[in-house]
């Protein structure tokens, strides 16, 4: 864990760049996707969907005085529960969508569908989809995250808020609208042709690399640490630590560290 990560919940969090998403902005996102039967009921769901834990009321922040308006005050709740809900809905909708589109019509097998699903819901794809919707503009993050941890370009946070946005839509409306949102985003912004040509299952790639390079049959070893609701993952070759990664879940942290390992071995650039 690097020094930046160790201090991100200790530095002064107040960030004048934060702006909560408005009703008009939520409605415009849905209009952009041509979801005409959307009716916004409670803007608080959507505001919460963009609140990173670094901007919540934490014990380590008690020494810092709120600077007043127009700076947003620290928040009570982060997006993490909505992210959990959105992640489950996303997986269900994508599975059904791929079944209807690629099995019923083209008779593609389970292996093909699984591979495609993994690529749609991987962190890299969700980060890109967040950017397509300009969700980074509505992030509520600490000044430390803004200045030192890639801020509004942080791929892990953008991945999280895409899932949290799905959770917010579901809680505010219903499953049908959340499903429409996911499908419209996929059909508008997801390049299936490019995806089928690119292998971004980094954990699988590093496993194949180990099999090819190391004659002793050794496999990558993953060790996990959870701190402040972030999953950190270390990748070892035998007893040697190669690289560290992180993510919003155990699976995401494994993909992150696997990608970094491929860069470490000059497989990726």
Predicted feature descriptions by range:
Residues 1-269:
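Double-stranded RNA-binding/processing signature
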């Amino acid at each position: 864990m690097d020094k930046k990560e160790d201090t991100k919940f200790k530095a002064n969090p107040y960030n004048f760049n934060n702006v909560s998403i408005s009703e008009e902005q939520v409605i415009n996102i849905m209009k952009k996707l041509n979801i005409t039967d959307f009716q916004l009921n409670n803007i608080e769901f959507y505001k919460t969907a963009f609140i990173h834990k670094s901007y919540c009321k934490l014990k380590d922040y008690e020494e810092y005085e709120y600077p007043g308006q127009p700076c947003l005050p620290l928040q009570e709740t982060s997006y993490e529960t909505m992210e959990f809900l959105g992640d489950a809905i996303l997986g269900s909708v994508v599975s059904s969508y791929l079944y209807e589109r690629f099995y019923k019509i083209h008779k593609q097998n389970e292996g093909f569908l699984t591979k495609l699903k993994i690529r749609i819901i991987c962190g890299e794809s969700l980060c890109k989809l967040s950017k397509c919707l300009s969700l980074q503009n509505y992030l509520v993050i600490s000044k430390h995250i803004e200045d030192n941890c890639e801020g509004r370009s942080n791929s892990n946070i953008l991945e999280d808020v895409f899932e949290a946005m799905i959770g917010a839509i579901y809680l505010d409306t219903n499953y049908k609208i959340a499903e429409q949102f996911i499908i419209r985003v996929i059909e508008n912004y997801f390049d299936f042709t490019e995806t089928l040509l690119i292998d971004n299952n980094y954990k699988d790639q590093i496993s194949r690399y180990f099999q090819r390079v190391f004659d002793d049959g050794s496999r990558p070893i993953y060790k996990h640490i959870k701190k402040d609701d972030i999953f950190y993952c270390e990748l070892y070759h035998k007893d040697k630590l190669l690289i560290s990664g992180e993510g919003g879940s155990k699976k995401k942290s494994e993909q992150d560290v696997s990608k970094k390992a491929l860069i470490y071995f000059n497989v990726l650039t």
